[in-house]
C-alpha cells in the first residue's frame, strides 16, 4: 500500500514535478531536485509519444470518473487492529528498520502469504461489469474470515479495504460503483494485518480483451519489479534497485514514477525509503540480512505528472495515459531476497 499525499503538488518544467511528499510508501520532507543523468534518446521519446497517442486514440473506454462510494465496512471486535485505525491522521513514518526476530519472521510470512492469497482471489474477480466496490467487499470478507485486518481501512481515513486503480489511475484508487469494462487494466493493492504484522502486495490485472500496448506496459512493469528484487541481498546498496529498474523501463521508452518503496513489518510504513528511480541523489544505504521491505515500481506510457481527485486519495496521470504497478514484500538474506508475498 502507498502513503497518502498530504501536500499540494506544483507541476513545472515539462514532465517534472516538485511534491513535498512522495507517495509510494512514505513521505520525505524535502523538495525534489531537478532530474539529472542521461536523457532518453530522442527515438525512445518519439516512440513513447506515438505509443501514447495510439493508445488514447484506440481507447474504447471513456476516461475514468468517480463512482459512488459505499459506506465503510465493519470489522469484528475480536480482530486485532493497527493503532492508526482510531485516528483519521496519516501515521508518521517509523524511523525503525523492520528486522523481525525468528518468531516475527514466522508471523510476517503468514501475513504476507495471506495478502498474496487474497490478491490472487481478487484477481479472479476481474472481469467486465464487476464493480471495484464488489471486489473490495470480497477482499474485506476474505481478510476478516482469516482473522486479519485489511490494512488500508482507516489508514489516514482511507474508506476502503483495498486500493483499486484502473487505467490512468496510478494508485490509491478508492473502490466504488464504477463497473470494470472490457479493455481496462486494474491494479489491486492488498495489505493485511495479521498477528501484529503487515503483508503488502499488488498486481496489475487485465480485464477482458486488452490491447497490445497495455499488455506490454503491464509485462514490463512486472519485469521491473523482478529485476529490482534480483539485486537485493545483504550488503547491497539500495541505489542498485533504482538503477536496474530505470534502465529496464527506459529500454521500452516508459517513464518511471519517482515514488518510493518502504520498510514494512509491525508497522505498515517505515524506513528505509527506497527510491525506485536512478536519478535520486540521497544518502547511501545498504541492505541488512533479516530486513523486510516492499518494492513497488509504477510505469507510465506518457507523463508522470499527476492530478489528485477531490477525494484526496485518487491519483491519475495528467495526460490520461495508462499506468501499471506491481509490488512484493521481500526478506533480505545473505545470498539474495526471499519474496514473502507469494501464495503457497
Swiss-Prot record:
One of its GO terms (cellular component) is chloroplast. Ubiquitous. Its main location: plastid. InterPro entries: Creatinase/aminopeptidase-like (IPR036005), Pept_M24 (IPR000994), Pept_M24_MAP (IPR001714), Pept_M24A_MAP1 (IPR002467). Binds 2 divalent metal cations per subunit. Has a high-affinity and a low affinity metal-binding site. The true nature of the physiological cofactor is under debate. The enzyme is active with cobalt, zinc, manganese or divalent iron ions. Most likely, methionine aminopeptidases function as mononuclear Fe(2+)-metalloproteases under physiological conditions, and the catalytically relevant metal-binding site has been assigned to the histidine-containing high-affinity site. Its cofactor is Co(2+); Zn(2+); Mn(2+); Fe(2+). It catalyses: Release of N-terminal amino acids, preferentially methionine, from peptides and arylamides. A divalent metal cation 1 binds at residues 189, 200, 327. Keywords: Aminopeptidase, Chloroplast, Hydrolase, Metal-binding, Mitochondrion, Plastid, Protease, Transit peptide. It is found in: Plastid, Chloroplast; Mitochondrion. Belongs to the peptidase M24A family. Methionine aminopeptidase type 1 subfamily. This is Methionine aminopeptidase 1C, chloroplastic/mitochondrial. It comes from Arabidopsis thaliana.
